């Protein structure tokens, strides 16, 4: 069991390293957690059942730490992807209301440019998308809201 658990954690460690690299490249304020080093525990002890039991307990703690790290980085990546989806939804709402406003188009253009940055400035994008949402809502509520607004 210990050999299999150790091998699984080593494989998971490599996957987490890839996730961390992706998040660091994508998100402007990524979590700051290290991926636990399974190799620091050394090889699986042979012979003594007490040592083996303690080793398995340490492996399980490493697994729990990896789950925490995985959750933190996955949540950060989802947050960045959520911003991209929100921009798509805001554009769709503008299209639905048939709004063609120069200022709204300019806000969308800035959002597009920020989405292309690596890492994405998530706090700035959040504020900008909030501004787009409020402005779009205001435009949609104006008399004669359909069509071009100058």
Name each model-derived stretch.
Residues 1-31, 70-104, 139-149:
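Amphipathic, heptad-repeat alpha-helical segments
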Residues 14-60, 99-138:
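Amphipathic, non-membrane alpha-helical rod segments
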Residues 45-76, 83:
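C-terminal structural cap/anchor segments
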Residues 124-128, 145-150:
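Long amphipathic alpha-helical segments
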């Amino acid at each position: 069991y210990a050999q299999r658990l150790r091998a699984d954690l080593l494989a998971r460690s490599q996957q987490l390293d890839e996730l961390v690299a992706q998040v660091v490249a994508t998100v402007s304020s990524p979590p700051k957690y290290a991926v636990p080093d399974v190799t620091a525990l050394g090889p699986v002890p042979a012979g003594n059942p007490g040592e083996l039991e303690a080793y398995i307990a340490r492996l399980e703690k490493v697994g729990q730490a990896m789950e925490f790290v995985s959750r933190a980085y996955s949540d950060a990546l989802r947050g960045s992807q959520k911003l991209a989806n929100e921009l798509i939804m805001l554009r769709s709402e503008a299209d639905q209301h048939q709004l063609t406003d120069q200022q709204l188009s300019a806000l969308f253009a800035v959002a597009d440019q920020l989405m292309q940055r690596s890492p994405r400035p998530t706090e700035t994008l959040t504020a900008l998308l909030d501004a787009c949402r409020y402005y779009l809502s205001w435009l949609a509520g104006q008399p004669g809201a359909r069509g071009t607004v100058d």
